[in-house]
């Protein structure tokens, strides 16, 4: 049952990431950073922070939402690909900014989400 829930939660998270990332990317065309995945990762960290701060006692629910949904909604692999693409295009300043914004923004968003629920 838990594995099926993680599968479903992961599928929903991945579909939402795909949709939202594409919507944001389309609306921010021409900017020098991949804003779609940056936004998705920060929102995902905020959501996971809120969820973690709620201290859900049911282990299955925690796995389905935390590991499944938020694990699939956020994406370190796409962040890595986009960073390397920026570097290969010799856009070093943009790649450094993207790394800093993603890591610091995600950590801060998680902390904010977690803090407001405790």
Curated annotation (Swiss-Prot):
Fluoride-specific ion channel. Important for reducing fluoride concentration in the cell, thus reducing its toxicity. The chain crosses the membrane at residues 4-24, 31-51, 61-81, 96-116. It comes from the Bacteria. It comes from Bacillus subtilis (strain 168). Keywords: Cell membrane, Ion channel, Ion transport, Membrane, Metal-binding, Sodium, Transmembrane, Transmembrane helix, Transport. GO terms for cellular component: plasma membrane. It catalyses: fluoride(in) = fluoride(out). This is Fluoride-specific ion channel FluC 1. GO terms for molecular function: fluoride channel activity; fluoride transmembrane transporter activity; metal ion binding. It is found in: Cell membrane.
